[in-house]
Amino acid sequence: MDPKNPLQKISAISLFVEDLPAAKAFYQSVFGVSVLFEDPTSVAVKFENLIVNLLLASEGSTLVHPATVGGPDSGKRFQISIWVDDLDGVCAKLAAENVTLLTGPQLQPWGMKTVTFVDPAGHSWEVGQQVK
């Protein structure tokens, strides 16, 4: 990492959602995150090293103009990944939270075992464990 380049540290990401209460409940329940800020159009939650801002999609155009905000059925353009030491334990927690796995657990060619799922707004999440 170049210490002179301040653009190498991602501090927060904004995810556009259609149902803010459902997204908030999902993130608190599945990820165990706490709410840092909340207003009628957004909820900011704190991961260990990142803030995720859940923002109503109807408000997102002010951030991305002149581009438009894609809907949940417009296709995946990114995936957020979390690396863990106990994928089986995470899978058990996801099952207890009624989270449907889209893939996995499966061994990937790059040496990780992974699962994927989506949040209520359709954002894709991958959880992976390094295989020894």
Please tell me what each predicted stretch does.
Residues 124-127:
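Short glycine-/small-residue motifs
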